[in-house]
Amino acid sequence: MLGLKQVHHIAIIATDYAVSKAFYCDILGFTLQSEVYREARDSWKGDLALNGQYVIELFSFPFPPERPSRPEACGLRHLAFSVDDIDAAVAHLESHNVKCETIRVDPYTQKRFTFFNDPDGLPLELYEQ
């Protein structure tokens, strides 16, 4: 048996490290656990935690190649975060000029959800518990 326990982290490459770090920490509520500038690669690496659990590895690299942006491009589609109150979460995001899609209802679970984007256009989802 392979023995997977849980997702350890998700790596995100940003075009502007400072902007993305501020978005994930100041707006979404992640905390910066550690940060290092790697001079040889002209690259930043930050480890971000959510509710005390390390979850995102945020990188910057000079001139990263673009990824396909069509809604159903092959590969990782989006990251989803659970929230207790989606209306309050959307209001918080919108107060920081983050545009959210209209809240929808999952026809299978009857739970409410919405999508928004990080500064580089990575789709993120809020899913009400």
UniProtKB/Swiss-Prot annotation:
Keywords: Metal-binding
GO molecular function: metal ion binding
Annotated Gene3D superfamilies: 2,3-Dihydroxybiphenyl 1,2-Dioxygenase, domain 1
UniProt entry tagged with the keyword Acetylation: no
Cystine crosslinks: none
Domain VOC as annotated: residue spans: 6-129
InterPro entries in alphabetical order: Fosfomycin_Res_Enzymes (IPR051332), Glyas_Bleomycin-R_OHBP_Dase (IPR029068), Glyas_Fos-R_dOase_dom (IPR004360), VOC (IPR037523), YwkD-like_dom (IPR037478)
Entry binding sites for a divalent metal cation: H9, E57, H78, E125
Cross-referenced NCBIfam families: PRK11478.1
Protein family membership: To B.subtilis YwkD.
Name this polypeptide is given: Uncharacterized protein YaeR
UniProt organism field: Escherichia coli (strain K12)
Underlying gene: yaeR
